[in-house]
């Protein structure tokens, strides 16, 4: 004799069994194309954005700290005035070229005043010699060419190997080891615009 049992099973929802993706409450505001005409790209670069698929936008120059292109690294002149260059060289610096390059690489393309601040805060022995060369290059630009220090930037910074001093250190059993004392030559080139106050005095 067969028995049949009828059990009422509640329906199971599919959304309870399927794993739900993680949804964060912090969602970034993604940029959608095409850009509306009211949108603005905060950038202090004077170059126009030439893309057919996007609408032309006007740069916002009110905030100088957001999305600022470094024109010194891109070698772009933002003004029609010609730049002038001068340099300072430190020869036979008593340190290896590799130790000086790791410091020089941090100031290449930076403004003159910012480079001095960076060199004062870096904990390397090479900063003491490099900061003197940078300061000398800025003095040459201000005194010899009449450039404004606020417009100066490090356009070129090179470190080349100099002469190697060879010394001998006595070792055990009558032997001797050679000591190589490296030197380097550091060249700092600054570029800037003439001082406006000097122009007014010359014109008057």
Swiss-Prot record:
Pfam families recorded: Ribosomal_L22
Gene3D superfamilies given in the database record: Ribosomal protein L22/L17 (3.90.470.10)
Biological process according to GO: translation
Signal sequence, start to end: none
Gene Ontology cellular component terms for the protein in this record: chloroplast; large ribosomal subunit
Keywords: Chloroplast, Plastid, Ribonucleoprotein, Ribosomal protein, RNA-binding, rRNA-binding, Transit peptide
Recorded GO MF terms: rRNA binding; structural constituent of ribosome
Subcellular location: Plastid, Chloroplast
Quaternary organization: Part of the 50S ribosomal subunit.
Family: Belongs to the universal ribosomal protein uL22 family.
Functional note: This protein binds specifically to 23S rRNA.
Extra remark beyond the main annotation: In legumes L22 is not encoded in the chloroplast but by a nuclear gene.
Protein name as it appears in the record: Large ribosomal subunit protein uL22c
Organism field: Pisum sativum (Garden pea)
